[in-house]
Every structure is written in C-alpha cells, then in structure tokens.
A protein has these predicted regions:
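Conserved acetyl-CoA-binding loop-helix of GNAT-fold acetyltransferases
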Residues: 120, 126-139, 143, 162-166
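Conserved GNAT-fold acetyl-CoA-binding loop/helix
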Residues: 27-53, 64, 88
C-alpha cells in the first residue's frame, strides 16, 4: 500500500465521511448532540451531515476541514480553530453537564490552535497515516503564525494518547469525564499541547 497521503481542503461531497470521522473522533458525543437537535424522524447522522454540508457558522463546516487521500480515496481528516484570548465568559447553567470539562479545558488552551477532531477511517489505520495527519496539522498552524497546538483526548483512548505523546504532545491539564447518555467511557479528559519551533 502506498503510504504517502495527499492533502486537500474539505469539499461539500465529503460531508458524509466528515460526519462519520467527527463522530469517531468524538467517541459518539457528536451523534448524541445531533440526535438532540434533529427534527422528529430525522436521523442523527443525516442531521450532522447536513450541518457539516451547509452551516457556515459551525466550526465543523466542511470548508474548515483538511482531508487526507490515498490514491484519490478519503482515508482521514482533521479540523481545528484558534481558541479565543481572552476566553469568553461561559454560563455553565446554559450548557449540559457532560460538556463542562470540555469547555473548561478549552479555556485553558486559550491562544492555541485547538485540534478539534482528527480521525482515520478504520480500514486505513495501522499504516502510519496518523503521523502524516499530525505533520500536516503542524504545517497549517505554523502557516497561521501560531506557536502551539492543543487537543483533548479521553484517558481511555490509549491508541490516540500514545500517538500524541510519541509526536511531542504533553499533558497540560485534565478534568473528570462526565458521561453523556449512552456513553460507557470513564476516566478523565486530558488537555495536551505541543509547542512549535
């Protein structure tokens, strides 16, 4: 298998794959949130796909993604954003409890480029593609003139945690995971950061 990936900007036609990759990266939380927002009779996946396809105000809008391809086939993708400084005041009564630790860690990451989602389709894992995606992330962030990349990872996601550590990310902070309905994960959310040279 050829191991060199080609990167491009996300396209509207990628929206179905991007919805899947976002949900995989978020360990089911995106689909749960979509299920709350979806209309009666609308599937969560259909709703998420449509939001990625058409809602320019969402961070997960398809134009904000970078897509990795092998021989013209989408194998993975990522997106992120600059965390505001100063971080806006949040009324925690306005957001569900299970999002509190995520928002708290995002606040700690103020000023960095937060890698919101990065994922590879299951059939393309184990070929070293994650490292190529992370290298592309660094190029994107450096081109913006920023000096640090942050990300959040669940403590139970051992494979991702290992890849991030191996690629120079260090733990900065953590918060106790609060499960959303249907989640079986436990432990902590970990905020990791990599300073760029």
């Amino acid at each position: 298998m050829q191991k060199v990936l080609r990167f491009r900007n996300g396209a509207k036609e990628d929206s179905g794959d991007l919805a899947l990759l976002l949900d995989v990266a978020g360990r089911g939380l995106p689909a749960y949130l979509w299920s709350i927002e979806a209309k009666q009779g609308q599937s969560a996946y259909e709703y998420g796909r449509e939001k990625i396809r058409s809602d320019e105000n969402r961070r997960s809008y398809y134009k904000n993604w970078y897509v990795a391809e092998k021989n013209g086939i989408l194998v993975g993708a990522f997106f992120g954003f600059i965390v505001e400084t100063p971080y806006p005041e949040i009324d925690y009564n306005d957001i569900p409890k299970y999002l509190h630790p995520i928002v708290e860690l995002e606040k700690v990451a103020s000023g960095s480029w937060l890698l919101q989602a990065i994922s590879i389709l299951p059939e393309y894992r184990g070929y070293g593609f994650a490292i190529q995606l992370l290298r592309k992330v660094e190029k994107v962030v450096k081109a913006l003139g920023l000096k640090s990349i942050s990300l959040q990872v669940e403590e139970v996601n051992n494979s991702a945690l290992g890849i991030y550590k191996k690629n120079g990310f260090e733990e900065i902070d953590r918060r106790t995971y609060i499960p959303f309905p249907g989640s079986r994960d436990t432990g902590d959310f970990i905020l990791m950061m990599k300073n760029l040279k």
